[in-house]
């Protein structure tokens, strides 16, 4: 790869960077298994093929790569004007996040931002739509300012208030408890909140 700005999935490097103290204790077969279950090679082919796509165009390319079809009910109820915080359950992780961002991004002409795990900032096509949250270490000093700027911006915000994708509990897939941050900040700023169900 000659393009230094192109991020490719490198499970080995991610583990070294995000867990430097524990990395030497991780068996190589575990690293190989992780590469296989995250489909490192397939995703890297996609990232290379979509390297020129940014924002909602990148989300559209993701939908194609995932061969995902979206059946949206009630899109006519989405307001055209005003600023909103869209909150949703997160049953599938990446796929539902991509789909929700794609639908809202198309509706609001690309003016959307997600609060996301900071690892996703490595995806150049997705990064313009992201406000990063560090889920594995200390938050950056400017994190509260970044969140405040997101709520103050003229972008629609997308949040998954459980903070993680849904978990299986007693045989049922459901979200973890939702954090109230989106309600508190939305009220402070004067944004309406819209609950979406995926």
Residue ranges and their predicted role:
Residues 1-84, 97-99, 109, 127:
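Membrane-anchoring hydrophobic helices of lipid-metabolizing enzymes
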């Amino acid at each position: 790869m000659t393009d230094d700005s192109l991020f490719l999935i490198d499970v080995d490097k991610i583990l070294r960077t995000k867990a430097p103290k524990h990395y030497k204790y991780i068996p190589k077969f575990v690293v190989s298994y992780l590469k296989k279950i995250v489909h490192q090679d397939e995703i890297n082919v996609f990232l290379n093929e979509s390297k020129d796509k940014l924002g909602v165009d990148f989300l559209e390319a993701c939908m194609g790569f995932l061969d995902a079809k979206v059946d949206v009910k009630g899109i006519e109820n989405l307001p055209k004007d005003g600023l909103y915080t869209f909150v949703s359950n997160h049953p599938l992780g990446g796929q539902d996040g991509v789909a929700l961002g794609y639908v809202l991004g198309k509706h609001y002409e690309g003016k959307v931002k997600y609060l996301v795990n900071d690892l996703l900032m490595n995806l150049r096509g997705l990064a313009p739509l992201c406000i990063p949250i560090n889920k594995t270490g200390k938050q950056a000093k400017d994190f509260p300012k970044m969140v405040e700027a997101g709520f103050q911006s003229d972008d629609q915000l997308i949040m998954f208030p459980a903070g993680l994708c849904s978990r299986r509990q007693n045989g049922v897939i459901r979200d973890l408890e939702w954090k109230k941050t989106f309600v508190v900040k939305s009220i402070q700023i004067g944004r309406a909140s819209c609950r979406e169900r995926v």
